[in-house]
Amino acid sequence: MKIVAPVMPRNVEEAQSIDVSKYQDVNLIEWRADFLPKEDIVSVAPAIFEKFAGREIIFTLRTSQEGGHITLSDQEYVDLIKEINAIYNPDYIDFEYFSHKAVFHEMLDFPNLVLSYHNFDETPENLMEAFSEMTKLAPRVVKIAVMPQSEQDVLDLMNYTRGFKTLNPEQEFATMSMGKLGRLSRLAGDVVGSSWTFVSLDQASAPGQVSLADMKRILHVLESED
């Protein structure tokens, strides 16, 4: 299971002052560009990609529709993604499938999509249908993050992940049940078939994230042969 940590600068000065040594035990860097004004994203990008040269980067524009900090039309959203990709070709690009389905056809040539769905209110009853629709599109990664209202919601998310991974062994999944109630799902990825777990360093990018230090300790125990 790969560890993903976010970088969330709010201006170019913060981007330039990122301490990359804090990320040495992280497998993937997620640049949450939505913490910037939309007109600053392209100008801040060089600082991010230079800081993390040689590291795998996920470019994410988490919009307000899915718990993020930026509001964009469908066309603004896809145009920004295309601009960053054309210049920097990040290893992964997050695409909010259900929020921007109208422009998904413009992303069909992208081989490195993280097709994502976030629901900060609930674990929807149609979660299995969401898994199915996104998996059929065969992106690089299917990412699903939902908020549980009960222990059963957490177990449902984990069971669906395991089921779809079993049926689609070549497909990568990154799934999590958010908040304190859902923390178990962030720790048990290897058991259910979730390839990534998202951790926090100085600031969490989603509720229920475990700190990098704690995650390293937990994974050490879980992966130990003794």
UniProtKB/Swiss-Prot annotation:
Entry EC no(s): 4.2.1.10
Amino acids binding 3-dehydroquinate: E30, W31, R32, R62, R186, S205, Q209
Keywords: Amino-acid biosynthesis, Aromatic amino acid biosynthesis, Lyase, Schiff base
Cystine bridges: none
Record-linked Pfam families: DHquinase_I (PF01487)
Residues at the catalytic site: H118 (proton donor/acceptor), K143 (schiff-base intermediate with substrate)
Functional description taken from the UniProt entry: Involved in the third step of the chorismate pathway, which leads to the biosynthesis of aromatic amino acids. Catalyzes the cis-dehydration of 3-dehydroquinate (DHQ) and introduces the first double bond of the aromatic ring to yield 3-dehydroshikimate.
Protein name: 3-dehydroquinate dehydratase
Protein species of origin: Streptococcus equi subsp. equi (strain 4047)
